[in-house]
């Protein structure tokens, strides 16, 4: 891969991770508001849903940012985007919800692309792979 490809993949991962890092941090710091939103959306077990949301969004966002376990994390975040679109943004008669729904579908496409092609050379996945190769060569 060329350096520009790796730079592009890094920028893409950073941009994909931002939404989750920001949203997950807001959920982490505001559990009552997040759980109230979940109640309004009709979710059961709002405390468990809050924990799951924080783990997926902050953990997945950090993993995507640093390119760690990128392919499986890409699949998890793609599924998360579809699930949240269907649960929280399915009222497409409301223009704002329609925009959020299709934003999530677009993010799903980005995460599927990352799941298919990986993080690139500028990632912890690539570093770990190089380390394994160096250890195997010793």
Regions found by a protein language model. Give the residues of each.
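Short juxtamembrane and helix-loop transition motifs at transmembrane-helix boundaries
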Residues: 31-43
């Amino acid at each position: 891969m060329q350096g520009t490809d790796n730079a592009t993949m890094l920028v893409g991962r950073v941009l994909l991770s931002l939404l989750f890092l920001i949203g997950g941090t807001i959920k982490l710091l505001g559990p009552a508001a997040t759980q109230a939103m979940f109640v309004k959306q009709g979710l059961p077990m709002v405390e468990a849903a809050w924990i799951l949301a924080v783990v997926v969004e902050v953990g997945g966002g950090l993993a995507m940012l640093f390119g760690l376990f990128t392919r499986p994390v890409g699949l998890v975040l793609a599924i998360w985007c579809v699930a949240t679109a269907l649960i929280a943004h399915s009222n497409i008669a409301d223009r704002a919800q329609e925009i959020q729904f299709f934003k999530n579908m677009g993010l799903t496409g980005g995460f599927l692309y990352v799941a298919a092609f990986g993080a690139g050379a500028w990632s912890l996945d690539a570093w770990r792979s190089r380390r394994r190769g160096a250890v195997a060569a010793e």
